[in-house]
Amino acid sequence: MFNTSTVRAAMKANTPTLVNPCEKTRQAAVASILREPRTAAAGQTEMLFIQRAERPGDPWSGQMAFPGGHREASDVSLQAAAMRETYEEIGLSLANADYLGALNHQQAQPRGRVLNMLIA
């Protein structure tokens, strides 16, 4: 069954493979946001997705995605970048959320930049 306890246990057992980006690499991070039902009868654990804006020339235009974006110089970590971007994009503060961990760093395609995935 998919719930935050299952995800928490999997993340605790996971040691993510990290990529050490070069100085010119632009990093990005996303937040995978889970919400447990308030009661057992209320349903199942939910995961939040957004629909990306439609823009000509954007290969991911209009697709479903996790909230997130590029890391700025003011972001102290990739987690901070994911939190800031989530608030900017959908107005949801993750300041009081339980941080469960990071997934393996992934190379974004086709641009070849490092995309670091976070779960919050």
Predicted regions: what they are:
Residues M1-F66, H70-A120:
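N-terminal leader/linker segments that precede catalytic domains of diphosphate-processing enzymes
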